[in-house]
Amino acid sequence: MKVSEVLRQVRQVRIPKKGFPVEETIAKELLGSCDNRADVIKVDDSGFVSEEGALYIAVVPKGLRARLDHQGLAFSSQDDWVSINSDVNQCLWLLSSKPYFLYTGFTQLIENFLDEEVSDVLSWMQEIGFSVEKSTFDLFLTQYARLIRDFDREKYIREYARLGFTHIEVNALASSLPWEKGVPGEFYADFYTYCPALDQFASSRLNQGIYPAEYLESNLKLLKDNARLALKYGLVPGLLCFEPRSVPETLLEKYPTLRGARVDHPFRSFKPRYNLSIAHPVVQKHYQELLIKLMKEVPELGFMTIWSNDSGAGFEHTKSLYVGRNGGAFMIREWKDDEAIAKVAAANIIRFFVLLRDAGSRINPGFRIITRLESFYGERDHLWPQLEERVDVEVNSLLVKGWESIYPHPRYPDVKVVGSAYQNTLMDKERGAMNELNSRNSRSYFYHAFGCHTNHEPLLGIPFPWLTFEKLQAFAEQGVRTLAHVGGIHPPDKVPYAVNQEIFRLFQLNPSLDIEEAVQKMALRYAGRTNADDLVEGWRLVEQAIRAFIPLSIYSHYGVVWQRLFVRPLVPDIDRIPESERAYYESHMCTSIHNPNKVDLSKDVLFDLVTKDYAHMAFSRIDENVWAPLESAICHFKKKKDEAASIGDQKAALVFEDQYFRARALKCLYITLRNTAVWIYAVQEYQDAGDPSAGSTARKLLDKMMEKEIRNCRELIELWNESPIEWMIISGTEETPFIHAANFAELLEKKITLMENHRKDEPSLDPDYMFRLKNNPY
């Protein structure tokens, strides 16, 4: 008898009386999927008895596990598992060790086992690959791409549970813009749209009335709704906040002695922004009250991730504050050396973490605080020994201080990478540092990214299954059990063939999987037996191109959107374009009025993003190694799409069509990034030229680049108008500096016009652009 037949014959579904919402969720979904109107009954432990026609769905605590042992059910000796059993009475059991693995097991049942013989899945027991897979900085659910059009939050959260994730962040602003007030000409207030602080959801006795009640209520409502959905599917809800974040000056005017550190960026911000001094007991009580209020609303909150020293947040007297070490009056007196200040600053950081951990633990005893270490390079030596129980870190590497990159690009060993899919290995030495923290019950959540963020933002659904697998395998080989996936997953209704995250799901359910076999089976499911090999071949070509690409600083991370690369003109002298004609993109660009990035793509504020030599190396290697496999992939997908359509194989035609348009979009992205590298090199080379021939060569490079970029814009417009799939993140409401909107094609037309009008201008850079001053009296 097949599993589907047994399910239709189920007369009663039994779940624990004192259980989890996910058990009831699964019971209802399962009965609905097999058109069975059986009753769902809640029973206590004594009711878990094998009976014909019964189906048990449960998370198994130790007490219940002992009882089930007597039913003849076998369990893993490990802590993390899921099982599907049919016993001698044809009683079915869907069980897991943790609530967040139960839904994964359920989807395995309905997606893979329905047509199997019951005897073949008599006792399916699977140990889980990673104890924790935490979502961090989820673009779509909580962060700056939450405006994405037609977003189905429940379907998205359900997909997390299906994939085998365990923890997700749930705090997001309900409005498109934060409450933070800015100053004309600066770019700073917008940064408060992501990782919203505790005071965006609740008020304390200290800051009552600072934010409008309706603003806090709407944010809290969204947080609670996200948390409810997380719990519905068995996930642990938590928070990601920039803290201690700046507060409105009106609060500091009322309590001037509570002024803490200046935490803004003096180039990007046109007014000083200060937070509260967390060394003061009143401020500590304020933070405790905020967190406890939130947890009374959502007692199941399991963690709070704290990012800091950026985006209007920072810890007092830490070295990486943008204006340098500074803070309130209570930590250390003046004229102390750097080491003494670092020691006190580290103690203050840990005290804050422990304060919040203990506050959260009053309601949820397992509550954890998680932070990043990069920002604390000046305090790391003092901070590390103080990391303690349930004070965790999330990292790209435990071996470095600050933002150093020590991992080689998978194809180019001379290029160092950090954080993206290109960081596909893990050094043996990471294990020792991780084990040291584990011995204190302090976890290390290692970053990885198989979505668009840090890889191909704003594109959706770009496949690189082998790179994805290699990082997971590296984690497993080093004994890593806790992960943090950066950037969110692909929304399932927009990316029906989310190859990379499917690899994660398969690995989570089978850490010893064979990647070639896994990719082949996935292709078989998507395209059918006749076309599976061809689909794998297309993926292989796309990944070959991805591996051959060289990242370009923030442009390969988020800068295509933030710096508006897709829609800003790449011309020899950007400064020659009148400001009024540049406004269509500069008004939504992450930049202040005097940022040299407005006219020089190699710079951002005082950073040298991409040097001339690196830019030359990048576009040379891209031209040599990327285009052949990527063009082959595009042609391959188109050919197979047309062939499948011609014989009426709709299933295969759809997947080849989907991959064809995504590969074309990837080519457009890579061309713009490549052309950005050419611009950086050629404009500087022209200015540096000591003889006419060098200048002439640079000029020719620029001319060819502009031809390519104009053609690329037209290709993007064609993609926009013709593609039946959602290949790019697009806002459903307004354009912001972090997301494009429905006017994307119109902006590309404006770019083309400006490039055609200014392509003959002489290459030029003003090294003093940032010193320009309107109404300069001199």
Regions found by a protein language model. Give the residues of each.
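Feature activates predominantly on carbohydrate-active enzymes
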Residues: 8-11, 18-20, 26-29, 76-286, ...
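Acidic, contiguous N-terminal accessory segments
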Residues: 1-84, 116-123
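Conserved beta-strand edge residues that scaffold enzyme active sites
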Residues: 45-47, 174-175, 244-245, 374-376, ...
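Short hydrophobic-aromatic micro-motifs
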Residues: 58, 92-96, 393
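A Trp-anchored, charged/polar loop motif used as the substrate-binding/catalytic surface
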Residues: 285-290, 424-428
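Extracellular/periplasmic catalytic domains that process cell-envelope and extracellular macromolecules
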Residues: 49-51, 85-87, 128-129, 297-298, ...
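Structured, solvent-exposed acidic/aromatic patches
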Residues: 319, 324, 328-334, 340-343, ...
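Substrate-binding groove of N-acetylhexosamine-processing glycoside hydrolases
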Residues: 296, 339-778
